[in-house]
Every structure is written in structure tokens, then in C-alpha cells.
Swiss-Prot record:
Gene3D superfamilies: NAD(P)-binding Rossmann-like Domain, UDP-galactose 4-epimerase, domain 1. The gene is easG. Monomer. Keywords: Alkaloid metabolism, NADP, Oxidoreductase. Agroclavine dehydrogenase; part of the gene cluster that mediates the biosynthesis of fungal ergot alkaloid. DmaW catalyzes the first step of ergot alkaloid biosynthesis by condensing dimethylallyl diphosphate (DMAP) and tryptophan to form 4-dimethylallyl-L-tryptophan. The second step is catalyzed by the methyltransferase easF that methylates 4-dimethylallyl-L-tryptophan in the presence of S-adenosyl-L-methionine, resulting in the formation of 4-dimethylallyl-L-abrine. This is Agroclavine dehydrogenase. It catalyses: agroclavine + NADP(+) = didehydroagroclavine + NADPH + H(+). It comes from the Eukaryota. Belongs to the fgaFS/easG family. Pfam families: NmrA.
Length: 290
């Protein structure tokens, strides 16, 4: 068995790769950037360049063929089209197992990853698992992310969620579940909502960060329109800004509180990381700018 990890420079794929190195699982990393893996296990790959598809599935002498693919869709407005094209190519090369990274609010047949989910379900003799995590904790700590920069620069977090609650999850836990799915003997054409243990409002996130950092962090509450404008000011495209703001309104209405999932522990045997634990480990990311 050899695993192909698309989205090789992404946060989740990097953690999956780390797990596979420790457990000696053969894998290749597919991305446009060679920094995603070593020269030996990196494959040049671009979702928008079908000529790179064969290269992504090519293995070195002595390696077993690619048998399962981690699908991490690209950050495109129409992300489903290129991913579906790659799935069809991979199936033509006898790949029969896929694990898709989707999102908690996106169901099969819905927009974006939902279209990919539906396509996987329609292919005969293909088995799959879809992971549907809620919002990433690392959105608060990754350099360049709007929330991270807002905490560092303005000591605030922005949202249009009002008092809606989110069970934020760490990419570390998503990767642990993904590694289990990618190495499972069989996949059951199923989807799994992944959540962290703490159901938090953004007010509570700000309060937790205040305690960890020793300086006041606030929650700047916005309307959906105000948040979209703020995101566009920060360089987000209009399509993505309005989509993100609309998702915040869904959170305000309780979209992330309706399902309680213990899937991380069920898959891995270990409880997911709590928000305070995450914040303590990422404290250096939020040093205030002078």
C-alpha cells in the first residue's frame, strides 16, 4: 500500500505525513511546491494542470502502486471541478479508495466539497470516507490568517456569530483520524463529523486567550455584511468573503451546535485536544506587534 497526500503544503497533510514517517507507512506528497516533501517522496502536482495528474500517481521502483488518496481540495471558488477530474483519472489508474476532507456544515450533494462527496458516492467499486471537521483552532494561530493577525495586531477576534457556539478542532486531531482512515483495510462509504471537546462562543475564545496571553483579547461582533467588508479589506475575494460571512450567520443560528460527535476518540482511542491546551502550545504565535 502507498498513500498519496494531495494538498501537501497544507496543515493537515503535513501532520499526516509526520504520522506516516513515525509509523513507516509508505506515502507520496503531491503539490506544486517541492517544499512539501523530500525529493524522494514529492510529486509535482497542480489541480488545474491535468498534465501533472499522471506524475502524482507515479511511484518509484520497489514501491507498491498508489492504493488510497487523501483529497484536500484547493482553495478555489469552483473547487469541485478539478478534484472530480483528478478522481476520475485516479480511478482509471485503478485507485479505488479515497478519503476526502470536507466540512461539518457541508452534506453530500451540497456545494463545494459536497459535490465531490456526491461524485465519490456515484462511482461503482470505489470506497471512501469523508471527514467533516468543524472550524480549525489553527485559524487563530497560523501566520497570515486573519484571526491570527487580528489577535497580534489589534488584540481582538472578529465574527458575525454573536453567541453561536463552535466545537473548534485542532488539525492535529483531524490528521490522526485521517491517518486511521487512510490505512484502514476497508472504507464504508461514510462521512464523519469531527469536533473538539469544547463548545465555545467567540466571547469565550477571547476570554480563554486573555487568560493565556495575560492581555485583554476582545470579540468584535459584526453583522454579516460588516464582516464581509472587513474580510475584503484584508484581501479576501468577494466570493469567499460573503461565503465566510454567511457561514458565521449559520453559526449564529446554531449550525455547529446541532450535532454532538465523539468521532475523534472513536477513531483514534484518544480524546481530542482542548482549546486551552491548544492556546498554551501556540502562545508564541500571538506576541503583540510593537
Amino acid at each position: 500500500m502507498t498513500v498519496l497526500l494531495t494538498g501537501g503544503t497544507g496543515r493537515t497533510a503535513k501532520h499526516i505525513a509526520g504520522i506516516f514517517r513515525q509509523t513507516n507507512v509508505p506515502f507520496l506528497v503531491a503539490s506544486r511546491s517541492s517544499s512539501a516533501g523530500t525529493a524522494e517522496n514529492h510529486r509535482k502536482f497542480d489541480w488545474l494542470d491535468e498534465e501533472t495528474f499522471p506524475n502524482a500517481l507515479s511511484v518509484d521502483q520497489g514501491m507498491k502502486p498508489i492504493s488510497v488518496v487523501w483529497l484536500c481540495p484547493p482553495p478555489l471558488y469552483d473547487l469541485a471541478t478539478p478534484v472530480i477530474k483528478f478522481i476520475d483519472f485516479a480511478v482509471s489508474q485503478n485507485v479505488k479508495k479515497f478519503v476526502l476532507l470536507s466540512a461539518s456544515v457541508i452534506q453530500k450533494g451540497g456545494p463545494a466539497m459536497g459535490k465531490i462527496h456526491g461524485h465519490l458516492d456515484s462511482i461503482k467499486d470505489v470506497t471512501y470516507t469523508v471527514l467533516r471537521p468543524t472550524w480549525f483552532m489553527e485559524n487563530f494561530s497560523t501566520k497570515g490568517e486573519i484571526q491570527c493577525e487580528a489577535i497580534r495586531r489589534d488584540s481582538t477576534v472578529y465574527s458575525a456569530t454573536e453567541n453561536g457556539k463552535i466545537p473548534f478542532i485542532s488539525v492535529v486531531d483531524i490528521a490522526r483520524v485521517a491517518a486511521c482512515a487512510l490505512t484502514a483495510e476497508t472504507l464504508k462509504n461514510s462521512d464523519h463529523i469531527l469536533q473538539g471537546p469544547d463548545l465555545l462562543t467567540y466571547d469565550e475564545v477571547a476570554q480563554a486567550l486573555t487568560g493565556v496571553l495575560g492581555r485583554k483579547i476582545t470579540h468584535t461582533k459584526m453583522t454579516e455584511g460588516e464582516l464581509a467588508e472587513k474580510l475584503m479589506e484584508e484581501g479576501v475575494t468577494p466570493e469567499e468573503a460573503y461565503m465566510h460571512a454567511a457561514m458565521d450567520s449559520m453559526i449564529k443560528s446554531g449550525s455547529e451546535e446541532r450535532v454532538v460527535s465523539d468521532e475523534v476518540k472513536e477513531w483514534t482511542g484518544v480524546k481530542p485536544r482542548g482549546f486551552i491546551n491548544f492556546a498554551l502550545s501556540e502562545k508564541a504565535a500571538w506576541r503583540a506587534r510593537k
